[in-house]
């Protein structure tokens, strides 16, 4: 058993930098569907009720746990074998966000509001889904017996989230304001292209984060399926939905588990 780091020195562990990056990747999409989308619609003098309806897309974050077991189970062709299960999902979902931003850059809110809101919903679903794998990858960075490091990692993840949100928001507003001042009419559309570049940088950094590529999770799922082989569809449901939930509650305890679920749903 390795000796745990104590005091402030634990925050200078290289793993904390990885967790900080993961937190920033998680928080950044909120800049897009929160700040950028609302201000974009406001600049076109759309009604407050319209902007309010656009805010409903955040509701997907409250229910992302419903498809968490599926994300844990389904592999991304080619990518999973090359870079790992967690990172392949994050990069795939980031690609959806990036493509949605590119589509936004060709649209006008006055004429294409429904399409813009749909793409915003797609970004929100991708963001909520990637949070599942980001949390899993973050937890894998620290051994289960390193309690102090685990607690420090949780706090750094929050700092990373706010860093991605605040710095991302600051850069977004700065770029949009600058482009407007120099005379670009489509300054928001060009700003979305700039955000695509930030997403690419995030993903380059993500590739340097190590991932546990052991097959323990797959072996456990296969064992569950074998135990319930005669049950047909029930086997898939139990190994994909029930077993991960049972494991989650066993690992964290009932109280902590419900607190985590409640925090995610806020």
Stretch-by-stretch model annotation:
Residues 1-13, 99, 105-117, 129, ...:
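Intracellular loop-helix junctions on the cytosolic face of multi-pass helical membrane proteins
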Residues 76-77, 88-111:
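C-terminal ends and interior cores of transmembrane alpha-helices
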Residues 20, 52-55, 80, 84-87, ...:
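Conserved glycine-rich helix-kink/hinge and helix-boundary motifs of the Major Facilitator Superfamily
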Residues 2-61, 122, 254-261, 266:
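Helix-loop boundary and gating motifs at the non-cytosolic
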Residues 27, 62, 124, 158-162, ...:
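Residue-level signal for discrete positions within transmembrane alpha-helices
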Residues 50-77, 97:
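Central cavity-lining transmembrane alpha-helices of secondary-active solute carriers
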Residues 27, 31, 124-135:
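Small-residue-rich segments within alpha-helical transmembrane domains of MFS-like 12-TM solute carriers
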Residues 40-44, 73-74, 132, 137-146, ...:
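Helix-to-coil boundary motifs at intracellular loop junctions of multi-pass secondary transporters
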């Amino acid at each position: 058993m390795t000796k745990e780091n104590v005091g402030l020195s634990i925050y200078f562990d290289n793993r904390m930098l990885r967790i900080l990056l993961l937190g920033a990747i998680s928080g950044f999409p909120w800049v897009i569907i929160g700040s950028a989308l609302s201000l974009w619609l406001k600049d076109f003098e759309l009604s407050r009720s319209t902007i309010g309806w656009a805010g409903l897309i955040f509701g997907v974050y409250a229910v992302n746990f419903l498809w968490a077991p599926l994300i844990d189970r389904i592999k991304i062709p080619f990518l999973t074998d090359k870079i790992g299960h967690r990172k392949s999902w994050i990069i795939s979902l980031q690609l959806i966000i990036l493509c949605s931003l590119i589509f936004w850059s060709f649209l006008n809110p006055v004429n294409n509001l429904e399409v813009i809101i749909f793409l915003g919903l797609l970004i929100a679903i991708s963001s909520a889904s990637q949070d599942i794998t980001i949390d899993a990858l973050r937890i894998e960075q620290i051994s289960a017996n390193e309690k102090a490091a685990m607690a420090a990692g949780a706090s750094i993840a929050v700092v990373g989230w706010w860093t991605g949100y605040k710095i991302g928001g600051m850069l977004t507003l700065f770029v949009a304001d600058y482009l407007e001042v120099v005379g670009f009419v489509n300054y928001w559309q060009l700003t979305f292209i700039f955000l695509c570049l930030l997403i690419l940088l995030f993903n380059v950094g993500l590739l340097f984060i190590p991932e546990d590529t052991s097959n323990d999770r797959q072996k456990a799922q296969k064992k569950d399926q074998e135990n319930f082989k005669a049950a047909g569809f029930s086997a898939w449901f139990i190994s994909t939905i029930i077993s991960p939930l049972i494991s989650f509650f066993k690992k964290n305890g009932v109280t902590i588990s419900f607190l985590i679920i409640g925090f995610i749903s806020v």
